[in-house]
Curated annotation (Swiss-Prot):
This is 6,7-dimethyl-8-ribityllumazine synthase 1. One of its GO terms (molecular function) is 6,7-dimethyl-8-ribityllumazine synthase activity. It is an enzyme of class 2 (transferase). Catalyzes the formation of 6,7-dimethyl-8-ribityllumazine by condensation of 5-amino-6-(D-ribitylamino)uracil with 3,4-dihydroxy-2-butanone 4-phosphate. This is the penultimate step in the biosynthesis of riboflavin. Its EC number is 2.5.1.78. InterPro entries: LS, LS/RS, LS/RS_sf. The gene is ribH1. HAMAP family: Lumazine_synth (MF_00178). The lineage of its organism: Bacteria, Pseudomonadati, Pseudomonadota, Alphaproteobacteria, Hyphomicrobiales. 5-amino-6-(D-ribitylamino)uracil binds at F27, A58, L59, E60, C87, V88, V89, N120. One of its GO terms (cellular component) is riboflavin synthase complex. It catalyses: (2S)-2-hydroxy-3-oxobutyl phosphate + 5-amino-6-(D-ribitylamino)uracil = 6,7-dimethyl-8-(1-D-ribityl)lumazine + phosphate + 2 H2O + H(+). (2S)-2-hydroxy-3-oxobutyl phosphate binds at E92, T93, R134. It comes from Rhodopseudomonas palustris (strain ATCC BAA-98 / CGA009). GO terms for biological process: riboflavin biosynthetic process.
Length: 163
């Protein structure tokens, strides 16, 4: 497995106080715990707050993000960014392809259409071993990567809004 490569982000626009939504699919509780741990650590380091919304599986994540964004906006407490966390392990049918591709496409569509910072931390793997290597904060830390991506996009949005 390749080592994780993370170039330091040069844009250090302040994101402290940002309100971030984490939507997690708890299909694999133990793997999800590791993904969530990595994401939360990154948000805390950036001074962001977060809410966690749990859904049954990865296919439900995009709709839950959209519903939560609208509800928070209507309540006058909008989210600044969102993070999608989940795990899809390949099985013997095409269900893996459907879940992984459709959840990714829906998240991308949502992010682009709404111009909304979103980090996709739905890991797609062939084995449990691959899932653990990607989920653990001490290894590839894909939960942390998703949080960093969401915060990076939020920095871009905030910086360009000031321009």
């Amino acid at each position: 497995m390749a080592d994780a490569r993370r170039a330091p982000l040069k844009d250090q626009t302040d994101v402290s106080g940002a309100r971030v939504l984490i939507v997690e699919a708890r299909f694999y509780d133990d793997i999800q715990d590791a993904l969530l741990e990595g994401a939360v650590a990154e948000l805390k380091a950036a001074g962001a707050t977060h809410d966690v919304l749990t859904v049954p599986g990865a296919l439900e994540i995009p709709a839950a993000v959209a519903i939560a964004i609208d509800s928070a906006e209507a309540a006058g407490k909008p989210y600044d960014a969102a993070i999608a966390l989940g795990c899809v392990v390949r099985g013997e049918t095409i269900h893996f392809e459907i879940v992984s591709m459709e959840s990714a496409r829906a998240l991308m569509d949502l992010s682009v259409a709404r111009k909304f910072p979103l980090g996709n931390g739905i890991i797609t793997v062939n084995t449990d071993e691959q899932a653990w290597a990607r989920a653990k904060p001490g290894d590839l830390n894909k939960g942390g990567d998703a949080a960093r991506a969401a915060l990076a996009m939020l920095r871009i949005k905030r910086r360009l809004a000031k321009a």
